[in-house]
Amino acid sequence: IINALSCPLWIGASVDILGAFEVERVVEAVCKNNYSVFTAVPTIYFSLIDKIERMTGKELELVQTKFKEMRLMMSGSAALAPEIHKKWSELTGQDLLERYGMTEVGMALSNPLKGEKRSGTVGQALPKVEVCLMEDNKVITEENVPGEIMIKGPQVFLEYWNQEKNTKESFFE
């Protein structure tokens, strides 16, 4: 919500909210409009790839042109498989910007807007964001050991509204 809705509105951009995802509705909207930014989760990109690969002729040419003309395309909220990233680039000419965030923090990690975007990664911590991996016992993991992502920074929200117990269980210094 923060990245897809609040940020564009804050700078005076307009936002199209298409409702529940239907691949036909998204393709139709993209073809009828001149969007400059598009953000979606990996499952939507997967469905769009499937749809585009079944298109032919002028319809295919139009949708590819419309996606290619966009200034920025982002993927977030889940891991984007490298093969989806590659296929999207082949079909549209767009190099997806993978990012990581959540409702509680907005965006915390990102590949660079300009420069090398590493497929299959969410990039590095944004300015003023500290990130570490922790084990269940709240101990920072050793290098190359899996763990839960922990984020600290000024963008982390303060609390769950009227949910003191949930807040205490979820946040610590």
Regions found by a protein language model. Give the residues of each.
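Gly/Ser/Thr-rich phosphate-binding loop
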Residues: 10-13, 35-40, 49-118, 130, ...
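ATP-dependent adenylate-forming carboxylate-activation enzymes
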Residues: 13-33, 51
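Alpha-helix capping/helix-boundary segments
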Residues: 44-45, 80, 156
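Conserved beta-loop-beta connector loops within the AMP-binding
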Residues: 132-151, 170
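Conserved ANL (AMP-binding/adenylate-forming) active-site segment centered on the GW(Y/F)…HTG consensus within
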Residues: 93, 154-173
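Conserved short alpha-helical elements in the N-terminal third of ANL/AMP-binding
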Residues: 1-15, 31, 36
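Short Gly/Pro-enriched turn/cap motifs at secondary-structure boundaries
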Residues: 116, 120-126, 170-173
